[in-house]
Regions:
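Glycine-rich hexapeptide-repeat left-handed beta-helix
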Residues: 14-123
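A positional/architectural concept
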Residues: 4-11, 28
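Short, amphipathic C-terminal "tail helix"
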Residues: 117-147
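Right-handed parallel beta-helix/beta-solenoid
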Residues: 1-4, 17-19
Length: 147
């Protein structure tokens, strides 16, 4: 790995491979044998399940995983990780609601981003907005089905 930025309190398990210019935000967890493609971003408080390939940006507060080395998909909200980091039930519900609204919306990606700009300001919303509103050339990792 070269020119990577790894945030505070981030856990990289054994055999994690980061290509160049990867950005991992604070409090993220990457399990064993995760491979991250160059120029990808991993959001705060997210968890990547073992033995998968991250080829798109992974949103904050999410769990992403694949099967036997396959592409990572969002599987849900990292509720246990948020509880362990001291988030209140209201904050966890807020993250869950905002991520469901974003990923389950049938509007275009640009319209979803416009809606995201309108949500109120608080710690959780700001982390989500700051990540998702930042330009990406890689796309955002998404669920295989609705959250």
């Amino acid at each position: 790995a070269h020119d990577c930025n790894i945030g505070n309190n981030t856990v990289l398990s054994h055999h994690v491979a980061l290509a160049g210019h990867v950005e991992i935000n604070d409090n993220a967890i990457l399990s064993a044998m995760v491979g991250v493609v160059q120029f990808r971003r991993i959001g705060s408080y997210s968890m990547i399940g073992g033995l998968c390939a991250v080829d798109m940006d992974v949103s904050p507060f999410t769990i992403a995983s694949g099967i036997d080395g396959s592409r990572a998909y969002i599987n849900g909200v990292n509720i246990i990780g948020m509880k362990r980091k001291g988030f209140s039930k209201e904050e966890i519900n807020c993250a869950s609601e905002k991520l469901k609204l974003f990923f389950n919306d049938t509007d275009t990606y640009q319209k979803r981003l416009q809606k995201l700009q309108l949500i109120s300001s608080n710690k959780v919303n700001n982390i989500i907005k700051d990540f998702l509103l930042k330009e990406t050339k890689n796309g955002i990792c998404h669920p295989k089905s609705l959250l």
